[in-house]
Amino acid sequence: MSPQRRNPVLGKSAGPRRQRMTWAGALGRIAAVLLLAWLGGFLWFTLTLPDPAPIAVKTDAVVVLTGGAGRTARGLAVLEAGSAKRMLVSGVDRNTTRKQLAAAADSSKSRFDTTDLGYEAIDTRSNAEETARWVKRHDFSTIRLVTSAGHMRRARLELSRVLPLSVLVVSDAVPVEPTAPSIATEYSKYLLRRVALMLGAL
């Protein structure tokens, strides 16, 4: 009996098909590993969200990053408790006045006598740069950072790029009820920023 002859058409198509299936399988496995890694990191991020700092903890100054309810009021409470000498509110809209900010925080305008408004920052990175300039100008060595729990890690990551190592930063997370989508968004932004910094992209 003569050996079975290979169909040249099938022979030509089988190789590329198997190659495509191999590539698809490899990409699927990579995607699965990345998804599991993201989920594991997200779980860690969620379970270790920072807490508010005790109001009695003293620092030279308090820095409030705008963008969420209760942050400016928290900073004012720190000032009123005598736990900081001065406050920076970073990322204030250019059309917002001191009087309007006082009204929004349900506070008198006089309480803003030791408060500086930062109008230059438009995102977390520029928040950090604005804060670093302010800290250097006043020669502060300790600051209390007020922002949301989900935003805190990314804010501290950006500050670590621009603040001297000698400056101590105390995390003070505003107690708000986070939602799963908001935490997932913050975790993804934090993760992407860490990767960018690791790759040397400022």
Annotate each PLM feature.
Residues 1-24:
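N-terminal Lys/Arg-rich, disordered targeting/topogenic segments
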Residues 180-202:
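A transmembrane-helix-recognition feature enriched in membrane-embedded lipid enzymes
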Residues 16-28, 177-180, 184:
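Structural motif marking the loop-to-transmembrane transition
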Residues 3-5, 15-16, 37, 41-42, ...:
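Electropositive, gly/pro-rich neighborhoods at or near active sites that engage anionic ligands
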Residues 8-11, 170, 192-195:
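Juxtamembrane amphipathic/hinge helix adjacent to a transmembrane helix
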Residues 47-184:
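A structural signal for short, hydrophobic/glycine-enriched beta-strand patches
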Residues 25-44:
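Hydrophobic membrane-insertion alpha-helices, especially the h-region
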